[in-house]
UniProtKB/Swiss-Prot annotation:
It holds the Pfam family WRNPLPNID. It comes from Mus musculus. This is Uncharacterized protein C9orf40 homolog. Transmembrane segments: none annotated. Residues 23-113 are annotated as: Disordered.
């Protein structure tokens, strides 16, 4: 709102803009809703809609699969497209939840998601992997240095008390 109020004095100082604004008896609306079906402003909390969210899969302008779009952005230049790597999906896009008649397919899809998330997470995808740590070597070093540090502190305390 502040930007609109600040813009009004500027428009009234310019003569040709004053003429444009005088043609409208009222201020023109900032946004005109597109003509067509009226859409509700808020989602309805219908139990049927919440129980079957994938009965009508969402479509985008390209009409392609969402996973292919996401994976295509983060591929290496030499990698084949994801359609050649994956198993063929059922008709209907693949972002639908499978029916109760095929629990094996649904379990396979859910078990694959964390691996894909890790692989295509941009923060971790571009970072160098950490080298493997040998915890046994760390424990040996920390145990030796801890005992040496305790012995050194005790010697320092004895020297301070003598003087």
């Amino acid at each position: 709102m502040a930007k609109r109020r600040a813009a009004e004095p500027l428009t009234f100082r310019v003569p040709w803009k004053r003429l444009l604004l005088s043609d409208f008896p009222e201020e023109p609306p900032l946004w005109v809703p597109p003509s067509g079906t009226a859409r509700p402003l808020k989602r309805q909390g219908d139990a049927g809609i919440m129980a079957e969210p994938a009965s009508a899969p969402r479509k985008r302008r390209g009409g392609g699969d969402d996973r292919q779009e996401l994976q295509g952005c983060s591929r290496e230049p030499g990698e084949p497209p994801p359609g050649e790597q994956e198993e063929p999906r059922a008709a209907g896009g693949g972002d639908r939840v499978e029916s109760a008649g095929s629990p094996q397919v649904a379990d396979g899809v859910h078990s694959q998601q964390p691996e894909e998330f890790w692989q295509y997470n941009t923060f971790q995808y571009w970072r160098n992997p950490l080298p493997p740590l040998d915890l046994a070597a760390l424990e040996d070093v920390s145990a030796n240095s801890l005992t040496e540090t305790l012995e050194d502190k005790n010697e320092g305390v004895e020297i301070d008390m003598e003087s």
